[in-house]
C-alpha cells in the first residue's frame, strides 16, 4: 500500500536530526501501523550532501516474521528495477532490530495531493498534463512488468497499488512510480 493509503501522511515535519546508520533523519514524512517514512541526508567529504527517503519498520513489527518477509521482498523487487520512471531503492539494511530501505528522494508531490489541491481550488488538471503523467507512469510499470533475469526468465513483477498517492511528480516534471511493496 502507498503512503497515503497505509500511513498517516503529514507534511514533512522538521525534527531534530536523528542519526540512523549513515543517514541523518531530518523530516518525518509519514507514520503508519507498520513503518515510518523520513526524509534523510547523508554527508560526504567537502560538504557533499545527498537526500534520500528512509522507510523504517517500527520496532513492534520487527518481530512479525510475515511482515519482515514482505518488507524484504519489497526491497528485493524494487532494487532490480532501474528505470527513470521508478523510484530507485539505493540501500537496504538492518540497524538494531529495525529493517529499513532507502530510496531516492523525489522533490515534488504525489498525484493525490496535486489532485486534491486542484479540487480545493475548483480547477481541473489540464488534459495534457494528465496524459503526460499517465504515460510516464505507464513507462515505469511496463518496465516492471517486462523485467526479466539475466537468463531471460520473466520476474512477473506487478505493482499491487497503482494509485495517485504512489505516482510522484517532481518539481522538474519527472514522473516516478513508488511503493512496489
Language-model regions: role of each:
Residues 133-134:
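Activation segment signature within eukaryotic-like protein kinase domains
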Residues 58-80:
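AlphaC helix of the eukaryotic protein kinase fold
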Residues 36:
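Conserved N-lobe ATP-binding subsite of Hanks-type protein kinase domains
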Residues 30, 73, 81-85, 98, ...:
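Flexible N-lobe loop architecture of eukaryotic-like protein kinase catalytic domains
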Residues 92:
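Activation-segment/catalytic-loop signature of the eukaryotic protein kinase fold
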Residues 138-157:
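Protein kinase catalytic-loop region centered on the HRD/HxD motif
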Residues 111-125:
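AlphaC helix of the protein kinase catalytic domain
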Residues 96-110, 114:
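Conserved short submotifs of the Hanks-type protein kinase catalytic core
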Amino acid at each position: 500500500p502507498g503512503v497515503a493509503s497505509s500511513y498517516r501522511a503529514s507534511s514533512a515535519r522538521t525534527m531534530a536530526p536523528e542519526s540512523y546508520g549513515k543517514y541523518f533523519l531530518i523530516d518525518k514524512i509519514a507514520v503508519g501501523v507498520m513503518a515510518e517514512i523520513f526524509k534523510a541526508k547523508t554527508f560526504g567529504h567537502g560538504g557533499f550532501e545527498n537526500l534520500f527517503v528512509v522507510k523504517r519498520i517500527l520496532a513492534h513489527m520487527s518481530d512479525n516474521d510475515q511482515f519482515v518477509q514482505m518488507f524484504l521482498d519489497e526491497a528485493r523487487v524494487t532494487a532490480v528495477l532501474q528505470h527513470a520512471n521508478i523510484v530507485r531503492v539505493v540501500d537496504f539494511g538492518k540497524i538494531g532490530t529495525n529493517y529499513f530501505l532507502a530510496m531516492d528522494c523525489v522533490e515534488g508531490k504525489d498525484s493525490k495531493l496535486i489532485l486534491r489541491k486542484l479540487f480545493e481550488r475548483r480547477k481541473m488538471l489540464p488534459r495534457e498534463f494528465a496524459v503526460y503523467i499517465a504515460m510516464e507512469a505507464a513507462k515505469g510499470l511496463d518496465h516492471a512488468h517486462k523485467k526479466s533475469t539475466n537468463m531471460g526468465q520473466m520476474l512477473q513483477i506487478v505493482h499491487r497499488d497503482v494509485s495517485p498517492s504512489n505516482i510522484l511528480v517532481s518539481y522538474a516534471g519527472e514522473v516516478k512510480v513508488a511503493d512496489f511493496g
